[in-house]
């Protein structure tokens, strides 16, 4: 959906459902 989840994943993990890590930010379809 939105390209950015408003979450960073510098540690390599995303906590927002449906988001994946595209370092250093979380993204989703």
Curated annotation (Swiss-Prot):
Q: What InterPro entries does the record tag this protein with? A: Cyclotide (IPR005535), Cyclotide_moebius_CS (IPR012324), Cyclotide_sf (IPR036146)
Which branch of life, at top level? Eukaryota
Posttranslational modification, per the record? Answer: This is a cyclic peptide.
Keywords (alphabetical) are:
Disulfide bond, Knottin, Plant defense
Q: Identify the tissues in which this protein is expressed.
A: Expressed in leaves, petals, petioles, and runners but not in roots (at protein level).
Q: Which SUPFAM superfamilies match?
A: Cyclotides
Q: Crosslink site(s) for Cyclopeptide (Gly-Asn)?
A: 1-29
Q: Which Pfam families match?
A: Cyclotide
**Bridged cysteine pairs (disulfide):** 5-19, 9-21, 14-26
GO terms classed as biological process: defense response
Q: Which family does it belong to?
A: Belongs to the cyclotide family. Moebius subfamily.
What is the documented function of this protein?
Answer: Probably participates in a plant defense mechanism.
Fill in the domain comment.
The presence of a 'disulfide through disulfide knot' structurally defines this protein as a knottin.
Name of protein: Cycloviolacin-O21
Q: What is the originating organism of this protein?
A: Viola odorata
């Amino acid at each position: 959906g939105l390209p950015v989840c408003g979450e960073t994943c510098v540690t390599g993990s995303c906590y927002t459902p449906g988001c994946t890590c595209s370092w250093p930010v979380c993204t989703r379809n």
